């Protein structure tokens, strides 16, 4: 599959390199296939690039790289589209917005990825996490995927 990305130029990807978001993302419900692209300049950041729209790419981070105590509190039904099994691990990412020096991340609506099945969903958490949590200016090391044991379903 060829993606003409505004940010990365032309990308050649196999279908197995894409994540399927059956419900799309909040505000982009019609966009279902996304590629996770590492940022060439910052190991703490990746980009979720739409396969259908070259002009749609979201900066994402592992929130635990910046907020080690971050936990996702959601209902079991919210994870049903990921088709998780008892051994599945969920990788949690949050979107980044703003400008250098004033970056924020959305801890209220994380992206959940089932790496084995290449499925994703965006959920709204059951707690009062901020939608615009300021990010520390110091670059953080990449965090490991958040195991399902650390995703608390209500």
Swiss-Prot record:
It is found in: Cytoplasm. GO terms for biological process: bacterial-type flagellum assembly; regulation of translation. Residues 127-154 are annotated as: Disordered. Keywords: Bacterial flagellum biogenesis, Chaperone, Cytoplasm, Translation regulation. Transmembrane segments: none annotated. The keyword Cytoplasm applies. Its main location: cytoplasm. InterPro entries: Flagellar_assembly_factor_FliW, Flagellar_assmbl_FliW_dom_sf. One of its GO terms (cellular component) is cytoplasm. Pfam families: FliW (PF02623). Interacts with translational regulator CsrA and flagellin(s). HAMAP family: FliW (MF_01185). Belongs to the FliW family. Acts as an anti-CsrA protein, binds CsrA and prevents it from repressing translation of its target genes, one of which is flagellin. Binds to flagellin and participates in the assembly of the flagellum. This is Flagellar assembly factor FliW. It comes from Rhodopirellula baltica (strain DSM 10527 / NCIMB 13988 / SH1). The gene is fliW.
């Amino acid at each position: 599959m060829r993606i003409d990305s505004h940010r990365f130029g032309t990308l050649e990807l196999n279908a197995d390199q894409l994540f399927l978001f059956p419900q799309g993302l909040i505000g982009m419900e019609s966009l279902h296939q996304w590629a996770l692209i590492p940022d060439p300049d910052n190991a703490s950041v990746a980009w979720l690039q739409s396969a259908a729209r070259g002009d749609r790419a979201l900066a994402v981070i592992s929130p635990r790289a910046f907020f080690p105590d971050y936990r996702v509190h959601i209902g079991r039904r919210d994870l049903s589209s990921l088709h998780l099994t008892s051994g599945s691990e969920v990788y949690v990412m949050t979107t980044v917005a703003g400008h250098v020096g004033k970056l924020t991340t959305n801890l209220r609506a994380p992206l959940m990825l089932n790496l084995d099945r290449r499925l994703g969903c965006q959920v709204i958490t059951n707690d009062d996490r901020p939608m615009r949590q300021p990010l520390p200016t110091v670059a953080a090391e990449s965090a490991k995927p958040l195991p399902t044991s650390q995703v608390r379903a209500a």
